[in-house]
């Protein structure tokens, strides 16, 4: 769900049943809700959904709307006679992109969270300028929602969905090549070859101004049967894909957070390297998803938008 006037939005991912989940936060200025319970030592094991939202701290209201939707469906942790949905959340800072930010007493993000939860039941979502990525930007191009998936040699499916609102850049210098270029599959973000060599200018750090708040938030998921500790390891390895795809990442004013979810549909062979392969695949999927989020983004349908151009405006085929 998104609001074209506000230039912000919410993405909700709902689970068919409680899924094992954990998370890692390496950004210096995160905004999250109920992520402490994802620590492997905490009691609650499964989540009913995860929310990725714009709006900075205001966006944390979005989980409330998702909770309401799930409770109406009688979904949640069974505590005596009460259902308590478990829905962690992370937010991005998109308050400086123009748009109407004086929404007053209207529960804007709660309403968008509720709408996003209803929309999630369809199982489909749009890439680019949509949902939690509607108002997202990067240092040099419009950001957005990205996604990618793959199958491991062991037969497990791994996927990633990300809101790319990076403080840095996902592309190399002034050219069209992505830092995630080496892991691209089937030209999914333009098929631009990775440069054979990098110049000093290519390596120069690019940021949104001096040190503005930003954040890239993501979910990686697998059908493998994992423990909470193993999901945490998968999130940690997946986060390396974020660092490969964006320069810089995990900065002092970033809130970079990666959730990992396991649907428990396929057993994991713990005698070999299957868990390591899951983490590697999750990192590759996240790097690809970041590039796709930028490649697919278009400018918001609002004349009030303040931000960089869309990638394909600058690098048209």
PLM-predicted stretches and their roles:
Residues 1-57, 61, 72-317:
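A structural signal for small-residue-enriched, beta-sheet-centric alpha/beta enzyme cores
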Residues 65-70:
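Active-site-adjacent structural elements in enzyme catalytic domains
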């Amino acid at each position: 769900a998104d609001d074209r006037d506000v230039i912000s939005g919410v993405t909700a991912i709902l689970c068919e049943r409680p899924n094992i989940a954990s998370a890692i936060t390496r950004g210096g200025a995160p905004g999250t809700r109920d992520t402490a319970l994802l620590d492997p030592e905490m009691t609650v094991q499964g989540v009913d959904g995860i929310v990725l939202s714009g709006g900075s701290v205001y966006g944390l209201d979005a989980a409330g709307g998702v909770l309401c939707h799930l409770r109406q469906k009688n979904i949640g942790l069974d505590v005596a006679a009460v259902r308590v949905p478990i829905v962690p959340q992370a937010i991005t800072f998109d308050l400086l992109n123009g748009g109407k930010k004086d929404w007053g007493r209207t529960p804007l993000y709660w309403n968008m969270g509720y709408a996003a939860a209803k929309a999630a039941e369809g199982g489909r979502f749009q890439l680019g300028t949509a949902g939690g990525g509607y108002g997202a930007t990067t240092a040099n191009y419009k950001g957005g929602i990205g996604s990618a998936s793959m199958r491991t040699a062991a037969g497990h499916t791994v996927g990633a969905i990300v809101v790319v609102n990076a403080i840095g850049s996902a592309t190399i210098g002034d050219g069209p090549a992505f830092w995630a270029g080496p892991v691209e599959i089937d030209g999914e973000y333009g098929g631009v070859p990775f440069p054979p060599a990098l110049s000093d200018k290519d390596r120069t750090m690019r940021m949104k101004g001096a040190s503005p708040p930003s954040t890239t938030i993501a979910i990686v998921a697998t059908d493998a049967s994992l423990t909470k500790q193993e999901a945490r390891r998968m999130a940690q390895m997946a986060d390396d894909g974020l660092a490969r795809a964006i320069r810089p990442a995990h900065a002092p004013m970033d809130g970079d957070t990666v959730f990992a979810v396991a649907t428990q549909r396929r057993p994991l062979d713990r005698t070999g390297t299957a868990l390591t392969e899951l983490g590697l695949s999750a990192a590759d999927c996240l790097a690809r998803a970041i590039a796709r989020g930028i490649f697919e983004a278009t400018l918001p349908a609002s004349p009030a938008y303040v931000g960089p151009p869309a990638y394909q405006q600058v690098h048209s085929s």
